[in-house]
Amino acid sequence: MKIAIAGASGRMGRMLIEAVLNDADAQLVGALDRAGSPSLGQDAGAFLGKDTGVKLTDDIDAVFAQADYLIDFTRPEGTLAHVEAALRHDVKLVIGTTGFTAEQKAVLHAAAEKVAIVFAANMSVGVNVTLKLLEFAAKHFSHGYDIEIIEAHHRHKVDAPSGTALMMGEAVAGALGRSLDDCAVYGRHGVTGERDPSTIGFAAVRGGDIVGDHTVLFAGIGERIEITHKSSSRVSYAQGALRAVRFLSARDTGLFDMQDVLGLR
């Protein structure tokens, strides 16, 4: 599996590089970084004390010419540039980027008609199993329970609520036969009045080096149920991304998520 990594000098990029280097079936063939990054020209394995022979570069086409797969956990604007390159070079994509607008997501859907893409806000096995638990719980706590989603991440995260929190909200709303767009409440401030029981609330915490904590609260009268997933390391995301690469090896086109990769549909 000839794999290139986007955002190679970042926290997630480095975790992905390490995972690829430790996988006997994978070969690191490219490492993309943003233009102007001080890491450009460095060996991709320098942070591990390894000489991989792969240098960090901002030459998108040069990297795509070497790769069969690109793993991308960057930002929407960068990811869309990589999608264009994937179409030019027929490279399959594993995308963990969050913060896309509806219009940007439409670009991914269109691209998937020509190349195979796994697009998931969270690629950990635990989170994706949690989504199934939430669907089950929502069906049984549909009446008399208020639903709130609380997420916490490190101080550097730029979007809120997190993509994972939105995935959880969509899982719950879907199980209840609702559209998240119609029932989500993002944060509360001032005099808000009584809570509308049909809503799903979101709260976001940012601080320190929190990798990712997510809790879905079903609050009833006399009891509350909390379903929580906590990430202590990004390694689970990296391992999930490699599972997604293996899944794509048997696909030529189509847009998939981790529920497809893990056979949870």
Swiss-Prot record:
<dbReference type="GO" id="GO:0008839">
    <property type="term" value="F:4-hydroxy-tetrahydrodipicolinate reductase"/>
</dbReference>
<dbReference type="Pfam" id="PF01113">
    <property type="entry name" value="DapB_N"/>
</dbReference>
<dbReference type="GO" id="GO:0005829">
    <property type="term" value="C:cytosol"/>
</dbReference>
<keyword id="KW-0220">Diaminopimelate biosynthesis</keyword>
<feature type="binding site">
    <location>
        <begin position="163"/>
        <end position="164"/>
    </location>
    <ligand>
        <name>(S)-2,3,4,5-tetrahydrodipicolinate</name>
    </ligand>
</feature>
<feature type="active site" description="Proton donor">
    <location>
        <position position="157"/>
    </location>
</feature>
<dbReference type="GO" id="GO:0016726">
    <property type="term" value="F:oxidoreductase activity, acting on CH or CH2 groups, NAD or NADP as acceptor"/>
</dbReference>
<keyword id="KW-0963">Cytoplasm</keyword>
<dbReference type="GO" id="GO:0009089">
    <property type="term" value="P:lysine biosynthetic process via diaminopimelate"/>
</dbReference>
<feature type="binding site">
    <location>
        <position position="154"/>
    </location>
    <ligand>
        <name>(S)-2,3,4,5-tetrahydrodipicolinate</name>
    </ligand>
</feature>
<keyword id="KW-0521">NADP</keyword>
<dbReference type="InterPro" id="IPR023940">
    <property type="entry name" value="DHDPR_bac"/>
</dbReference>
<dbReference type="Pfam" id="PF05173">
    <property type="entry name" value="DapB_C"/>
</dbReference>
<feature type="binding site">
    <location>
        <begin position="120"/>
        <end position="123"/>
    </location>
    <ligand>
        <name>NAD(+)</name>
    </ligand>
</feature>
<feature type="binding site">
    <location>
        <begin position="7"/>
        <end position="12"/>
    </location>
    <ligand>
        <name>NAD(+)</name>
    </ligand>
</feature>
<keyword id="KW-0520">NAD</keyword>
<feature type="binding site">
    <location>
        <position position="33"/>
    </location>
    <ligand>
        <name>NAD(+)</name>
    </ligand>
</feature>
<feature type="binding site">
    <location>
        <position position="34"/>
    </location>
    <ligand>
        <name>NADP(+)</name>
    </ligand>
</feature>
<dbReference type="GO" id="GO:0050661">
    <property type="term" value="F:NADP binding"/>
</dbReference>
<keyword id="KW-0457">Lysine biosynthesis</keyword>
<feature type="active site" description="Proton donor/acceptor">
    <location>
        <position position="153"/>
    </location>
</feature>
<dbReference type="InterPro" id="IPR022664">
    <property type="entry name" value="DapB_N_CS"/>
</dbReference>
<keyword id="KW-0560">Oxidoreductase</keyword>
<dbReference type="InterPro" id="IPR022663">
    <property type="entry name" value="DapB_C"/>
</dbReference>
<comment type="pathway">
    <text>Amino-acid biosynthesis; L-lysine biosynthesis via DAP pathway; (S)-tetrahydrodipicolinate from L-aspartate: step 4/4.</text>
</comment>
<comment type="function">
    <text>Catalyzes the conversion of 4-hydroxy-tetrahydrodipicolinate (HTPA) to tetrahydrodipicolinate.</text>
</comment>
<feature type="binding site">
    <location>
        <begin position="96"/>
        <end position="98"/>
    </location>
    <ligand>
        <name>NAD(+)</name>
    </ligand>
</feature>
<dbReference type="GO" id="GO:0051287">
    <property type="term" value="F:NAD binding"/>
</dbReference>
<dbReference type="InterPro" id="IPR000846">
    <property type="entry name" value="DapB_N"/>
</dbReference>
<comment type="similarity">
    <text>Belongs to the DapB family.</text>
</comment>
<keyword id="KW-0028">Amino-acid biosynthesis</keyword>
<dbReference type="InterPro" id="IPR036291">
    <property type="entry name" value="NAD(P)-bd_dom_sf"/>
</dbReference>
<dbReference type="GO" id="GO:0019877">
    <property type="term" value="P:diaminopimelate biosynthetic process"/>
</dbReference>
<protein>
    <recommendedName>
        <fullName>4-hydroxy-tetrahydrodipicolinate reductase</fullName>
        <ecNumber>1.17.1.8</ecNumber>
    </recommendedName>
</protein>
